[in-house]
Each structure stands twice: as C-alpha cells, then as structure tokens.
C-alpha cells in the first residue's frame, strides 16, 4: 500500500518535471502563448465538430505538452451540462441564447466573444433531382422537408428565415439537431433539409447546398468563452486566442463559416 | 395463520450478503426517481400541464403504444408458440434473431427500419410504388418503430410461459380428436393467458418509453410523430423544468397502468 503510494508520488513528480521540460522546449517553437500545458476540455456545438477537431490538432502542435479534448453536442445540452457542474474549460456555442444560459448562471469568466457565424442553406441530394431553387420550392406538393426543431439553434434560424420569406412550410419532421436533419437527406428520406452551410461543406459527396437570400436575415453567431470553474484556465485562454488567431480563422473559413 | 407466518419466515432469514446489495440495488433504481420528484416545479405544475402540446404528445404516446402492443400480440404469440412447440432446424438461430432488438441500440434499429421501410428501402419502395404508402414520418411509422423494439419482450415472456405450461392438457385434447388450431385456441391460449398478459404489459411499457428508433425512423412532428419521450428530449434543450414535468406525467401514467393491470390480471395463482 505505502509502496504504491510512493510510486505514484514519484510518477507525479516525474510528470511535473516532464511538463516543465515541455514548457522550456516550446520557447523555440512558434507558440503564440506562454507556457501552456495540460488538458484543455472544450465543450463545442455539434456544427463545430469538423473545424474544431482540426483546430485542436493544430493547437496541440503549436503548444507541445497540451492535449485538447472535445465534447461535441447540441449547444443547449452542453449549456445544461456546464450549469450542472461538468468540468469544462471552454464553451463554444452555436447561438448566443445558449451562451447566455451559462453566463446568467454565473458560470462564465469575462465576456463571450463572437468568433464565427453560420448561415442556413437548403441541403438537397447530390444533383438536386427536384430542382429546388429557393424556400418557396419547399412547399411544393410531394417535396418532403426536414428542419431542426425550434428548440435548437438551427431550428430557430429556420423559423426566422421562413418568416422573412413569408413561406408557410409544413415539414415532414423537426429533427433534434442539424446533423440528424442532414442525415435524413443523405438517407434519401426527405428531398431537402434546412441546415448550415458548414454541414453541406462537410459532406460534399452526399449533398449539394442551395443558397437562398433570406438566410442573411437569420445568421447564427457563435460565441466562445472561458468558463469560471475551468480546471485549466491558462490553457482555456490560449485555446480561445488560438481559435480567434489567423490559423483558427483559416480553418473556420475553409469549413464555410464567416469570421468577424 | 399461514398468511402471517409466511412473511415472518421470509424476513428473518435474509442473509446480509443478499440484503445489502438488494437494498443498494433498490436505492440505485429509486433515487433518480426521487431526484425527479424533488426537482419538479410543483408550484407551476398546473400551468405546465395545461400547455397545448403536452396532451397531444400524451395521447399519441398512449395510442401508438397500444396499437404497437396489439401488433406484437398478433405476430408475437404465434412466433413464441413456434419457438416453444415446434422442433425445426435453425430454431436456436431464430430465437437469437428474435432477441436482436433487445441489444441493438434503438437508434441503429431506426436506421435499419429506414433501410427496409424507407423511401429507398427494399419493402418501402414497393409499398410506395404499389399502394402509395410511406411509413417514415407517419404515425404508422411510430407504431412500427415501437413494435420493433418491444416485440422481443412479448415473445420471450410468452415463450417462457409456453415452456412452463403443462403439455399434457394439449396432448389430452389431441387424443380427444382436437385439431392443432383448436387445441391452440381452446387449451394453450387460456393456459398461458397470464404469461401473455405479463408479456403484453412489458411490451406496452417498452413501447411507451421508446425514443431512439422512433425519432430516427418516424422523425419528430407534433401531433403526428412526437411522442412523450421525444417531447421530453426536446424540452430538455430549452427548459429542464418542462422536461421534468413531462417525465413525471409519463411516469405517473405508466405506473398507474402497470399497477392496475398487475392487480387485476397478473397475480400468480
């Protein structure tokens, strides 16, 4: 028993020494931050899956000794998890409303900043067999449409865009998140779905995106924030800075986001 | 009297090695329920119950679970009989197949249903082409998804009852000249009626709580395919208190129905 505890202590000491080395070695590299180590836990909206995974890898490469772990889910589910005490360092939300849930509960640290924005497009099967050109075409008889439920950010945006266009749409289904709506197009069960531009960019071999002017009236802003109870605050700040840096913006732009 | 003697003999001889884990197990199952009850917004409960979507989802849930159970009875009882009474090659494989939906994640079950009954599915394309029927995103689709997930519960319960039943009654009927169908309807069915009821109740309860296969195969549209579990999940996105209230309703309804059925029909002889 005692022997095991001693061994654990030695290992812990060795790890501390190692991470110290890592911090020293990093001074040679192009690291944008100062002596950041350890695990950074990022809670991010499902629509950020592809771009944040890329950014996380780049961040680890730029900051040896760090490890970024992600929890991707619907923004509202993440906000609930954070407010129930989940040990997260950073929260990146697909809508300001879900960020507000977290800051209102006193779990934010500082002010959230908008780092990206996303717009809706109509996802259609490859080649657009139904010839859908705009929101009005979605109400044609025989055209089945999936939208997100209004409780999630993409559904709220869809509702707004349809209202702006004056289109009264009865969808076949209101999906629980944007990826589920996209999946219904991929499976061929619906003829169109209202999803984010980034989701279409991420699935180029399965779907095409049809842009429509009303989407400019329903832009989703993505805020990011370091959390108050972040176990690794320095790491969290460095990650947020990286997302907003030139490197981070390049990844986000390539994925189809607009960066402010 | 025997009534008072039985519990005393039962309670005093419980070994600690069984009692402690049993109590822990009970606490593990009961505490989350207590958590729901403690966190429920009792003061605003009446207003929340009166919200229009709640009753619609509840009615749809009760209807679809009941129709799904009827469908399971229609198909599941003969299947259970086949498994219990007829020796045929590959019976073990068939029995294993029947239990697949038990271990399959329901969401995967939903995708599998789409691949068969969806617009591009093997059966779905034929249904749409011949009869103009499309099952996904319809109430019938909800019933199908629930029946797929719940039927194994019925088949296993009924098969167990059939295997436990005394076959001498059936043999006697046969020697008296009854055909196999007559024996089934007049002897076997009444004999295993309690088992069938128990299986149907389990099946109904499973169908009532079905989420994954339903949202994947039938989608989510209020009044048409949005059952209570789907309403709970979406309420959770914005309003946890609303989700707790919806869960409490579902809980109350299922406990009430199960308790009522238990007292009336499933008491062991």
Residue spans of the language-model regions?
Chain B
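Membrane-water interface segments at the C-terminal ends of transmembrane alpha-helices
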Residues: 9-43, 52-163, 187, 191-212, ...
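Short hydrophobic, aromatic-rich alpha-helical segments embedded in or entering the lipid bilayer
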Residues: 221-234
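Short coil/turn motifs that cap or connect alpha-helices
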Residues: 89, 179-180
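Glycine/proline-centered hinge or cleavage motifs at structural transition points of membrane proteins
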Residues: 176-178, 190
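Short, charged juxtamembrane terminal tails flanking transmembrane helices
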Residues: 2-5, 263-269
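The alpha-helix within a helix-turn-helix
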Residues: 173
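Short glycine/proline-centered loop/turn elements that form peptide/ligand docking sites
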Residues: 165-169
């Amino acid at each position: 028993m005692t022997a095991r505890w001693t061994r654990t202590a030695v290992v812990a000491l060795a790890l501390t020494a190692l991470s110290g080395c890592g911090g020293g070695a990093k001074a040679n590299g192009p690291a944008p931050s100062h002596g950041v180590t350890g695990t950074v836990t990022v809670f991010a909206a499902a629509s950020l899956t592809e771009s944040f995974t890329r950014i996380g890898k780049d961040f680890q490469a730029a900051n040896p000794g760090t490890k970024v772990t992600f929890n991707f889910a619907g923004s509202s589910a993440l906000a609930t998890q954070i407010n129930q005490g989940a040990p997260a360092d950073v929260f990146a939300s697909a809508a300001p409303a879900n960020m507000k849930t977290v800051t209102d509960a006193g779990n934010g640290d500082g002010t959230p900043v908008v780092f990206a924005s996303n717009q809706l497009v109509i996802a259609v099967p490859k080649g657009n067999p139904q010839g859908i050109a705009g929101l009005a075409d979605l109400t044609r008889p025989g055209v089945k449409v999936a939208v997100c439920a209004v409780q999630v950010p993409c559904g709220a945006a869809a509702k707004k865009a349809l209202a702006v266009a004056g289109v009264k749409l009865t969808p076949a289904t209101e999906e629980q998140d944007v990826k589920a709506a996209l999946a219904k197009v991929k499976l061929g069960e619906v003829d169109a779905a209202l999803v984010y531009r980034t989701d279409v960019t991420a699935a180029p071999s399965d779907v095409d995106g049809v842009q429509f002017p009303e989407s400019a009236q329903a832009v989703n802003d993505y805020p990011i924030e370091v959390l108050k109870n972040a176990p690794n605050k320095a790491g969290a700040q460095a990650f947020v800075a990286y997302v907003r840096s030139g490197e981070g913006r390049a990844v986000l732009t390539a994925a189809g986001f607009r960066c402010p | 009297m025997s009534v008072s003697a039985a519990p005393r003999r039962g309670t005093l001889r419980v070994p600690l090695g069984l009692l402690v884990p049993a109590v822990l197990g009970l606490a593990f199952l009961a505490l989350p329920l207590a958590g729901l009850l403690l966190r429920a917004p009792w003061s605003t409960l009446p207003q929340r119950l009166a919200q229009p979507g709640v009753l619609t989802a509840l009615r749809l849930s009760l209807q679809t679970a009941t129709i799904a159970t009827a469908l399971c009875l229609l198909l599941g009882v003969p299947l259970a009989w086949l498994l219990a009474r007829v020796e045929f090659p590959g019976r073990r494989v068939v029995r294993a197949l029947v239990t697949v939906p038990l271990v399959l994640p329901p969401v995967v079950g939903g995708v599998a249903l789409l691949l068969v009954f969806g617009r591009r599915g093997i059966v779905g394309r034929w249904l749409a082409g011949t009869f103009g029927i499309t099952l996904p995103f319809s109430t019938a689709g909800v019933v199908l998804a629930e029946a797929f997930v719940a039927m194994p519960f019925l088949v296993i319960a009924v098969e167990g009852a059939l295997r436990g039943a005394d076959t001498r009654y059936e043999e006697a009927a046969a020697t008296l000249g009854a055909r196999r169908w007559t024996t089934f309807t007049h002897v076997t069915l009444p004999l295993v009626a309690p088992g069938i009821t128990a299986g149907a109740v389990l099946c109904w309860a499973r169908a009532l709580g079905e989420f994954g296969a339903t949202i994947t195969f039938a989608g989510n549209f209020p009044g048409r395919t949005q059952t209570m579990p789907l309403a709970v999940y979406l309420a959770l996105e914005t309003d946890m208190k609303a989700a707790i209230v919806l869960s409490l309703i579902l809980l109350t309804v299922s406990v009430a129905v199960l308790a009522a059925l238990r007292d009336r029909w499933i008491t062991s002889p």
